[in-house]
Amino acid sequence: MQKLILLSIVLILISCSGKGQNKTMKNKTMTDTTKVISRTEEEWKKILTPEQYHVLRQKGTDLPFTGKYYLNKEKGMYACAACGNELFSSDMKFDSECGWPSFDKEIAGGKIKKIKDYSYGMVRTEIICAKCGSHLGHLFDDGPTLTGMRYCVNSTSVDFKKK
């Protein structure tokens, strides 16, 4: 069972690793007036489900093609599942065929921070909620839209608010 989980993780990382990861990303800071949330890990454990805690706080990853928002085509807003910070509009979503919800840009206002991630022997850009510091997914520069960006987001990391 552990070998299957390890194999799944390796395949997930390979499929999301993208190409051309040598571009540098600058960390963006939050520019709107939203107050930053600071909680202990014990407080997060009480607020979040075990699955949410694993993904949002321990930087876990949904299995590909299993997330509830992967194929969602409804109009609305995607917000951080931990704090409600609005991150993406459905107009920013596209089908990247990578197995996770993908967006080509974020809502303005510095609501997402970008951090270099050196885990698993790769260099990637992790995206976290600027309001609460929760893990959302990773950012790649292989998107097919005009921005060239692909925000690869875990369904567990977001809630969807239908318009």
Q: What is each residue range found by the language model?
A:
Residues 17-46:
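Sec-dependent signal peptide cleavage junction
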Residues 36, 45-79, 85-163:
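A short Gly-Trp-Pro
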